[in-house]
């Protein structure tokens, strides 16, 4: 009888322990479902535009406003970015620099005003035809858990190995890739975990070179690079931006001193 009671007690304890574990799991699932529902309830963008080849790559923002969570982020901004020029956007953190770039590339839609590319409102482009005109190099680089070659070819899937190598040379990353045990076939970890910050950034630039888009958006691309890698990274950026329309977000004066125009953004407005 005592043995039976002991076994029953252990079985009851195990059941209660499982119930407690499942209770925690259900809470996590509930939170995830709530977050998913919040995303699904957001208004969706109309991305069914026309296949448009712009006549030029002039960019114009006309009296643009944008709010997020009922807070005005961009307030009545007008700006002209002529084709094949470099525009540097500077200002304090949270001032609206990255938001302006996101609106230009139509990651978000403006609340009022308009953004045009080649004289055509970006809303009239299909998403694919609009994105064909842009390449991006962000401060936070995301690389896939795949070979280095496939990460570079993400900019153009049909590229040959020779074209990948050429892009890597221009981005100053061919040398360190060649020293890896499997070269361009080396598989890197999720997010490029096995590479340094400078190495990841140069692979990101090689990817953008491979795409060969006419407009390049550089979002603080050299902000977190150590001094040893900065020279090579600057050379890589120079190779990427030749004969392109450049929009550059930066904190340091020396990275923008060669810009054709410098725009100071503060509290969602152009102040200089």
Identify the function of each model-found stretch.
Residues 1-7:
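Membrane-water interface of transmembrane alpha-helices in multipass transporters/channels
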Residues 6, 13, 131:
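Conserved catalytic core of two-component sensor histidine kinases
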Residues 11-39:
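Cytosolic ends of transmembrane helices, especially the final helix of ABC transmembrane type-1 domains
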Residues 14, 42-45, 182:
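Flexible, glycine-biased helix-capping/connector loops in cytosolic signal-transduction modules
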Residues 38-41, 45, 153:
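Conserved E/DxxT/N motif and adjacent residues on the DHp alpha2 helix
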Residues 42-46, 117-120:
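Short gly/ser/thr-rich secondary-structure transition/capping motifs
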Residues 44-54:
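Pre-NBD coupling/linker segments of ABC/ABC-like ATPases
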Residues 54-272:
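ABC-type nucleotide-binding domain
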């Amino acid at each position: 009888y005592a043995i039976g009671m002991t076994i029953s007690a252990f079985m009851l304890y195990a059941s209660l322990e499982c119930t407690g574990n499942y209770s925690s799991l259900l809470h996590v699932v509930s939170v995830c479902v709530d977050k998913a529902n919040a995303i699904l309830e957001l208004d969706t963008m109309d991305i069914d535009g026309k296949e448009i080849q712009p006549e030029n790559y002039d960019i114009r923002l006309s009296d643009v406003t944008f709010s997020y969570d009922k807070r005005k982020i961009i307030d009545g901004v007008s700006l002209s970015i002529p084709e094949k020029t470099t525009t540097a956007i500077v200002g304090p953190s949270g001032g609206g620099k990255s938001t302006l770039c996101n609106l230009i590339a139509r990651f978000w839609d403006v609340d009022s005003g308009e953004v045009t590319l080649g004289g055509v409102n970006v809303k009239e482009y299909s998403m694919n035809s609009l994105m064909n005109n842009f390449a991006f190099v962000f401060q936070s680089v995301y690389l896939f858990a795949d070979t280095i070659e496939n990460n570079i070819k993400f900019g153009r899937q049909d590229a040959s190995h020779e074209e990948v190598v050429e892009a890597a040379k221009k981005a100053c990353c061919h040398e360190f890739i060649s020293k890896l045990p499997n070269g361009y076939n080396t598989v890197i970890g999720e997010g490029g975990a096995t590479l340094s910050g400078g190495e990841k950034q140069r692979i990101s630039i090689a990817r953008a070179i491979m795409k060969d888009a006419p407009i390049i958006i550089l979002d603080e691309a050299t902000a977190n690079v150590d001094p040893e890698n900065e020279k090579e990274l600057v050379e890589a950026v120079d190779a990427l931006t030749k004969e392109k329309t450049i929009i550059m977000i930066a904190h340091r004066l020396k990275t923008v001193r060669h810009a054709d125009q410098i725009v100071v953004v503060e509290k969602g407005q152009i102040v200089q």
